[in-house]
Design a protein with these regions (language model features):
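A conserved mid-protein helix/loop that constitutes part of the nucleotide-sugar donor-binding site
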Residues: 1-10
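Nucleotide-activated donor-binding/catalytic signature segment of Leloir-type glycosyltransferases, i.e.
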Residues: 24-40
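Conserved acidic donor-binding segment of nucleotide-sugar-dependent glycosyltransferases
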Residues: 38, 93-102, 108-115
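Short alpha-helical segment that forms part of, or immediately flanks, the ligand-binding pocket
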Residues: 46, 65-73, 85-87
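Short alpha-helical donor nucleotide-sugar binding micro-motif in glycosyltransferases
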Residues: 46-52
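Aromatic "clamp/platform" in nucleotide-sugar-dependent glycosyltransferases that forms part
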Residues: 60
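Short hydrophobic beta-strand element within catalytic cores of glycosyltransferases
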Residues: 77-81
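A charged, aromatic-enriched C-terminal amphipathic alpha-helix characteristic of glycosyltransferases
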Residues: 99, 115-146
Length: 146
């Protein structure tokens, strides 16, 4: 996440970036970056998705990232990086960027300029419903807390 934050701070998109998840030693002084921390409540997590336009998954490695399905279920496009492009698996609304400012800016602008069309296309995805998403998140939280 820190590599992405460094890159984001150099981008001139007039955008805000929010971080959700466990992370120690996060010291963010940029007013355009907000840190939520770990969010256990499924409804709060859904609200966070709904309050944002794009999800960015800055991971270098991933197995089956729930954040992608959660974002797509809320019809929020996702930007991932080349390292993990194998996770796309025919899903609409996932965009691959190189890990550089120009590529990321280009993808972000494309998504924002075509947002409604992208969201419409994302309806073709077979994804969890809101109810099943809440259940999946709740089950994960229960498992991690036991």
């Amino acid at each position: 996440i820190f590599d992405f934050i460094k890159m984001f701070e150099k981008i001139e998109l007039g955008a805000e970036f929010s971080i959700v998840g466990n992370s120690e030693n996060v010291n963010i002084s940029n007013k355009n970056i907000k840190f939520f921390g770990y969010v256990a409540d499924p409804k709060s997590l859904i609200n966070i998705y709904d309050e944002h336009n794009i999800t960015v998954l800055p991971s270098y490695t991933e197995a089956t990232p729930y954040v992608v399905d959660e974002s797509l279920a809320r019809r929020r496009p996702v930007i991932i990086f080349e390292d993990i492009e194998y996770i796309i698996r025919n899903k609409k609304g996932i965009f691959v960027s190189k890990r550089d400012i120009n590529s990321f800016t280009e993808k972000t602008k494309y998504i924002m300029e075509n947002y409604k069309e992208i969201q419409k296309n994302m309806e073709k995805n077979v994804l969890p419903t809101k109810k099943s998403m809440i259940k999946q998140i709740s089950d994960i939280i229960k498992t991690e807390n036991s």
